Amino acid sequence: MAAAAMPLEELERWLQARVDRQPIATSLAMLDGYVAAIVAGPVSMSPLDWICPLLAIDADAFNHGDTPEFAAIFAVALRHNDISNVLRPRPTSSSRCTGANPW
């Protein structure tokens, strides 16, 4: 059975239900802020190093595609990509015309 990402509304409820496990994020707003910091930060991190504490899950959850934990991981990965796309620098129109490197 193919794994599917947890819908964001369900992820919000799932995070709130895990407060006793002390995840870094207990709401979507906290999750978005944390993921934005990961995306914008000066160093790259392994997903295991930041998703596990973010969701208060064990690394083994990455190996089981038919669990709520994996569905939450999948949702966080998609959210990471969405936030990355928003924060990614875009070339300016003048750099496209001149061929200048915008980075």
Swiss-Prot record:
Q: Which InterPro entries match?
A: YgfB-like, YgfB-like_sf
Coiled-coil residue spans:
none
- Which Gene Ontology cellular-component terms appear in the entry? membrane
Localization recorded for this chain is:
Membrane
Q: Which domain of life does the protein's organism represent? A: Bacteria
- Keywords linked to the UniProt accession: Membrane, Plasmid, Transmembrane, Transmembrane helix
In the UniProt record, the signal sequence range is none
| Bilayer disposition of the protein | Single-pass membrane protein
Membrane-spanning residues:
33-57
**Protein's name in the database:** Uncharacterized protein y4eI
User: What organism is this sequence from?
Assistant: Sinorhizobium fredii (strain NBRC 101917 / NGR234)
